[in-house]
């Protein structure tokens, strides 16, 4: 497997693993601080963590590209626009997700509705003339079926909070497609850092408007906040951006949806939750979808 192919497969799987295991840390914060406070804090931590990485990397990097003043200006403009677009989509998606949970949607259904971006990404991609192969569409359907088995425990009926989560899924799909556009022009780590900067600003403004600033509550969640800030955001989302460079966004999305599988497994190992037969089947179906999405089928040759 070539280096680029390794990056396009391993990075999103690692991101999915980090996000799946981060649910434990998020649950620890949910009862202590509000959604906007949680997001503003974790995104701010991610900015600081990535700034350190950028400073160290740029300090030791020897083969820096030589750009003219005009080229630097154009590159910086693309970077800031990309950071703003990615950060806005991320902030809206994550805050709508938390609002849906606060409105009463259970975590399992929230996970399923949020992960519907697996379907929305290829559908939206059609409007940008991005072709999706038949095997990849089958993999998308399989992944949705797997998510249903993993996340939905009882009857599926729509509640008010579910509409907020549908908006969340739409925004995550937009987030993935915006990343797909800007990774062609921007440094992945710097783009990730700027998206967190704008997401932190948007969440902080909402926090000061809708939630009281409770420093003791924030400090009581210091360890889980550091985990989600550094690993879930700083590492996980940066891996997503690096994986999407020159990749098929639909295939990367299917790999990222492994988050639900890792969340179930983490719950079984860390929280000692019992996995049902239904969840085992869901894991198998999801892995089948991932394998199918990675198989390179030969294209049919047109008749002469």
Language-model features: where?
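Glycine-/small-residue-enriched transmembrane alpha-helix faces in small-molecule transporters
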Residues: 1-37, 41, 87-88, 92, ...
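Helix-helix packing/entry segments at the starts of transmembrane helices
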Residues: 16, 39-41, 110-116, 179-200, ...
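Juxtamembrane helix-loop-helix junctions in multi-pass membrane proteins
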Residues: 17-48, 105-109, 174-198, 213, ...
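Specific transmembrane alpha-helical segments of multi-pass solute transporters/efflux pumps
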Residues: 22-23, 57-113, 149, 229-247
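C-terminal-most transmembrane helix of multi-pass membrane proteins
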Residues: 43, 55-59, 221-223, 231, ...
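Transmembrane alpha-helical segments that form core, pore/gating elements
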Residues: 46-50, 120-122, 127, 157-211, ...
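C-terminal transmembrane-helix exit sites in multi-pass transporters
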Residues: 49, 53-54, 117-138, 261-280
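Hydrophobic transmembrane alpha-helices of multi-pass small-molecule transport proteins
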Residues: 50, 132-152, 172, 203, ...
């Amino acid at each position: 497997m070539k280096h680029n192919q390794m990056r396009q497969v391993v990075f999103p799987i690692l991101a999915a693993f980090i996000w799946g295991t981060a649910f434990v840390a998020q649950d620890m914060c949910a009862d202590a601080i509000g959604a906007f406070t949680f997001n503003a804090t974790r995104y701010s931590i991610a900015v600081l963590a990535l700034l350190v990485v950028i400073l160290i990397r740029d300090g030791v990097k020897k083969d820096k590209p030589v750009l003219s003043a005009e080229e630097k200006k154009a590159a910086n403009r693309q970077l800031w626009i990309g950071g703003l677009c990615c950060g806005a989509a991320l902030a809206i998606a994550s805050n709508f997700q938390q609002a849906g949970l606060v409105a009463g949607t259970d975590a399992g259904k929230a996970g399923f509705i949020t992960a519907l971006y697996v379907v929305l990404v290829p559908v939206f991609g059609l409007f940008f003339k991005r072709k999706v192969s038949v095997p990849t569409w089958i993999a998308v359907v399989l992944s949705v079926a797997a998510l249903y088995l993993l996340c939905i425990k009882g009857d599926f009926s729509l509640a008010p909070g579910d509409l907020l989560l549908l908006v969340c899924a739409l925004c995550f799909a937009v987030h993935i497609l915006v990343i797909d556009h800007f990774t062609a022009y921007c440094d992945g780590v710097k783009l990730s850092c700027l998206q967190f900067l704008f997401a932190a600003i948007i969440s902080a403004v909402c926090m000061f408007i809708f939630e009281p600033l409770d420093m003791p509550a924030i400090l009581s969640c210091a360890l889980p906040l550091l985990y989600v800030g550094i690993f879930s955001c700083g590492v996980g989302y940066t891996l997503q951006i690096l994986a999407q460079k020159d990749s098929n966004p639909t295939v990367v999305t299917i790999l990222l949806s492994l988050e639900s599988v890792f969340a179930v497994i983490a719950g079984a190992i860390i929280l000692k939750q019992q996995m049902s037969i239904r969840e085992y089947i869901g894991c198998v179906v999801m892995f089948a979808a991932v394998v199918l999405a990675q198989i390179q089928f030969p294209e049919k040759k047109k008749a002469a």
